[in-house]
Amino acid sequence: MVEIDDGVEMAVGIFVVIILAANLLPTAFDQIFNASTSSWNSDVTTLWELLPLLSVVGLLLMFVYWARKAGKM
């Protein structure tokens, strides 16, 4: 049985994520930014407008978790 190096596994994983993101993100952004919020109440509309900011905060938290985990190794 062939043992795969951790670096190769990480490189393949990053490659797969980039390919999936390149295919799925344009459609997701199109659906999010073209959604009609005219019939929604003001509270839901406000949360919808904050969605990009909440996404950025989530990504930053993910990177902090990853960096702390990598620092412990």
Curated annotation (Swiss-Prot):
Tagged with keyword Nuclease: no
UniProt signal peptide: none
Lineage: superkingdom: Viruses
Chain spans, region Hydrophobic: 9-29, 47-67
Additional information: The virion does not contain any lipid membrane.
Example of a GO cellular component annotation carried by this entry: virion component
Organism encoding this protein: His1 virus (isolate Australia/Victoria)
Post-translational modification: Probable lipoprotein. Lipid modification may enable hydrophobic interactions leading to the flexible nature of the virion. The protein probably exists in 2 forms, a lipid-modified one and an unmodified or less extensively modified one.
Subcellular location field: Virion
Protein's name according to its UniProt entry: Major capsid protein
Lineage of source species: Viruses, Viruses incertae sedis, Halspiviridae, Salterprovirus, Salterprovirus His1
